[in-house]
């Protein structure tokens, strides 16, 4: 199995969140999802708020929520530099659902005092956290 794996490293400003061999990954690119496997062509891509999905070297499907950043694929390794990232198994789902509800309420209000772009991003982050916490199919 090792011959079909490559290194994934997920880094935030605070820490290295993940570093291990994986079989494949799907990242939320700005213009759609980006699938990466071993021997992928070199690539640098901007990432959107969303769910990063990957399969470990032992075949376990995992998810993490990321809130944008960049991804570099080079020499059979992938490095994700994320503004924030959180393992799906560590997400407080109740807190994420509450954040989603708050953002939706902010977006319903038509007021110059509400920063709608910021509320939309908060909603996207909450949805990504909820989706990352769900069990893979």
UniProtKB/Swiss-Prot annotation:
Question: Does the entry feature the keyword Zinc-finger, yes or no?
Answer: no
From which residue to which does any coiled coil extend? none
InterPro entries, alphabetically? ATP_F1_dsu/esu_C_sf (IPR036794), ATP_synth_F1_dsu/esu (IPR001469), ATP_synth_F1_dsu/esu_N (IPR020546), ATP_synth_F1_esu_C (IPR020547), ATPsynth_dsu/esu_N (IPR036771)
Q: Which UniProt keywords apply?
A: ATP synthesis, Cell membrane, CF(1), Hydrogen ion transport, Ion transport, Membrane, Transport
Q: What is its main location?
A: membrane
Pfam families registered for this protein in UniProt: ATP-synt_DE, ATP-synt_DE_N
Record text on subunit structure and interactions: F-type ATPases have 2 components, CF(1) - the catalytic core - and CF(0) - the membrane proton channel. CF(1) has five subunits: alpha(3), beta(3), gamma(1), delta(1), epsilon(1). CF(0) has three main subunits: a, b and c.
Q: Which HAMAP family match?
A: ATP_synth_epsil_bac
Fetch the NCBIfam families from UniProt.
ATP_synt_epsi (TIGR01216), PRK00571.1-3 (NF001846), PRK13446.1 (NF009980)
Functional summary from the UniProt entry: Produces ATP from ADP in the presence of a proton gradient across the membrane.
* UniProt protein name: ATP synthase epsilon chain
Q: Which gene encodes it?
A: atpC
